[in-house]
A protein has these predicted regions:
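N-terminal organellar transit peptides
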Residues: 1-76, 83-188
Length: 188
């Protein structure tokens, strides 16, 4: 990904997903040829998250971004699992993905908008999202939990059950190694 003469830049993003925070992040990232993005979020707007993922996918195609999961990814942040095409690097501090039924934050729309049509569009979007979750490796039971309006957490020690390949990096004898992520083993 990098040559010895290319300097990498690291950016920490641990904010909610809104147009101003995402635009600021993208503007910062475009200032550097190679970015290590340490990402954590409480969630936010789905459409804004999809804009960010489109941006990250374009950079990933060029090989000039690494997305590190740090702390947790909630709500709209889970779209990294379903829509981001690059590898996801896992920090030792990553704890969980938090899923719930997606919504369009319809309280932001004026009441003159046909609420039945908005609900129909949302339900259609949600079905597409559930199909993507199935591809990622969530079980039917897990998806049904989300569909019924309940919360679902996938903790760091459960990431190995998903079909997504997660990567971790480790320094060994002063050499940076990239290897598949092994979830921690939690004794109960």
């Amino acid at each position: 990904m990098t040559s010895k003469d290319t300097l990498e830049h690291s950016i920490i993003f641990n904010q909610e997903i809104y147009p101003d925070t995402v635009q600021e992040l993208m503007d910062r990232m475009t200032q550097y040829p190679i970015v290590n993005l340490y990402f954590s979020t409480d969630g936010g707007e789905l459409d804004t998250m999809l804009v960010l993922i489109d941006f990250l996918n374009r950079r990933a195609e060029q090989g000039n971004v690494r997305v590190y999961l740090s702390s947790y990814c909630s709500s709209a942040g889970t779209l990294l699992l379903t829509d981001y095409n690059g590898p996801l690097y896992v920090q030792p501090t990553f704890r969980f993905f938090y899923f719930h039924v997606p919504d369009f934050m319809s309280y932001k729309f004026r009441k003159v908008v046909n609420e039945d049509r908005l609900r129909d569009l949302l339900l259609a979007y949600n079905e597409t999202y559930y199909e993507k979750l199935k591809v990622v490796g969530l079980t039917r039971k897990q998806i049904d939990t989300i569909r019924k309006g309940h919360e679902l957490y996938i903790f760091a020690d459960e990431l190995g059950k998903l079909k997504t390949t997660f990567i971790t990096d480790e320094f060994e004898d002063r050499t940076l190694l990239y290897k598949p992520y092994d979830p921690p083993i939690i004794k109960k």
